[in-house]
Structure formats: C-alpha cells, structure tokens
Amino acid sequence: MSFAASLYEKAQPIWEAGYNHPFVQGIGDGSLEKSKFQFFMKQDYLYLIDYARLFALGTLKGNDLQTMSTFSKLLHATLNVEMDLHRAYAKRLGISAEELEAIEPAATTLAYTSYMLNVAQRGSLLDLIAAVLPCTWSYYEIGVKLKGIPGASDHPFYGEWIKLYASDEFKELADWLIQMLDEEAKGLSSKEKAKLETIFLTTSRLENEFWDMAYNERMWNYNG
C-alpha cells in the first residue's frame, strides 16, 4: 500500500462524516437553504485565496522544475477555475465583487487557513502537500458521490458546483498531489510519516468543521 493510500484509509471515517453532513447532503438533494450556501461561498472564497498562496509557496519550495510546474498549474486552477465558479455563484446570489473582497473570515476559516499556512511556512514541501491534499482529494470524492445521485448534477442551482468537483480536470489536480506525496515520501522514517499523518488528519477534520460552520452560518461562537 502506498503512503497516500494509507492516509486515505485512515481518513475514511472523517471523510464519510463530511459526506454525510447535512450541508453536503443538502447540495446533493437540492434542499440546502440558499443562505447557508451563500455563507459557505463567501467563506470558501476567502479560503481559496490562502489556498492559492499555499500553491505559490509550493512553487517556491519545489526542488525541481516538474514540481514547480505542477504547483504553478494548481495555482492557476485555483485562481482561474475554482474562484471563477465562486464569482459566478456570487453574481447569482446578488453578491457584488466589492462585497466579496470585503468579507471577514469566520473563526473556522481563520483557524483552518492559519493552520495550513503555518505548517507550510515552517515545514517542508511534504508538510505543505499533506496539509492541502485532503481538501482537493475529499472534494473530488464528494463531487463523484453527489454526481451519482440521480438528477443531482442537473440541479438548476447546485449542479454546476457538483460538476466542477466531479470533473476529470479536478481529479487531475488531486492525482498530481497524491503522486507528489508518494514520490517525496519515499525513504521517510516512521516518525516523519507519523508527522505527515497528523497534518493530513488535522486538515481532514478542519474540512468537516468548515461544512458545519457553513451549515450553521456561524461566524464566531462568542461575539463579545
């Protein structure tokens, strides 16, 4: 079993909980309230800005031209594919470009992005990959599962979201990261692998916190 496959196996209970979250299920059956999705898209827009920064940092940390090129492609896809989807949904939801740029991060968004940036800046290229991979990989899995629900990808509002994350193009992004992880992890000690596992499982859990934040439209638990 490859190292990435072993991480995938250990993360399955977390990812299953994410897929079964009422936010995700609401996208699948079309019942999710628009206000919850709007909250999600605003916070996810902020998230993607920092996610793009992580890919830019990956380009800097790359040890060879191929790695640098791969992270450059991931950066481009985030800025010009995922964020375009968010801007298109924002327009449909009546959110102006100015409003998008002025969004304040919720506590969960801040915790999630700060954790990844801290790991990536202080750690190695492998640490960075372990931090960003759960988002891309689990989103593709969710997209494929939701696409398997009859009529889900044809939904007039949520269908485009499902189709993007279930696409072959998005799978390619996840595959690049998986392949890099396995290649870079060759020869690591058990201790080094355990560190990467902790990072991978932590960001997997933070993904679920993000779904829950959006479903409850929660900025902060305490606003005093």
Swiss-Prot record:
Disulfide bonds: none
Listed pathway(s): Cofactor biosynthesis; thiamine diphosphate biosynthesis
Translocase as UniProt keyword: no
Gene Ontology terms for molecular function: thiaminase activity
Single GO cellular component term: cytosol
Originating organism: Halalkalibacterium halodurans (strain ATCC BAA-125 / DSM 18197 / FERM 7344 / JCM 9153 / C-125) (Bacillus halodurans)
Name used for this protein in its record: Aminopyrimidine aminohydrolase
Marked site: Increases nucleophilicity of active site Cys: Y47
Gene3D superfamilies per UniProt: Heme oxygenase-like
Catalytic machinery residues: C135, E207
Broad class of enzyme this protein falls into: hydrolase
Binding positions (substrate): D44, Y139, Y165
Subunit structure of this chain's protein: Homotetramer.
EC numbers: 3.5.99.2
Alphabetical list of InterPro entries matching this protein: Haem_Oase-like_multi-hlx, TenA_E, Thiaminase-2/PQQC, Thiaminase_II, Thiamine_Salvage_TenA
GO biological process: thiamine biosynthetic process; thiamine diphosphate biosynthetic process
Keywords in alphabetical order: Hydrolase, Thiamine biosynthesis
Known role: Catalyzes an amino-pyrimidine hydrolysis reaction at the C5' of the pyrimidine moiety of thiamine compounds, a reaction that is part of a thiamine salvage pathway. Thus, catalyzes the conversion of 4-amino-5-aminomethyl-2-methylpyrimidine to 4-amino-5-hydroxymethyl-2-methylpyrimidine (HMP). To a lesser extent, is also able to catalyze the hydrolytic cleavage of thiamine; however, this thiaminase activity is unlikely to be physiologically relevant.
Family membership noted in the UniProt record: Belongs to the TenA family.
Catalysed reactions listed for this entry: 4-amino-5-aminomethyl-2-methylpyrimidine + H2O = 4-amino-5-hydroxymethyl-2-methylpyrimidine + NH4(+); thiamine + H2O = 5-(2-hydroxyethyl)-4-methylthiazole + 4-amino-5-hydroxymethyl-2-methylpyrimidine + H(+)
UniProt key word tRNA-binding: no
Source organism, top-level taxon: Bacteria
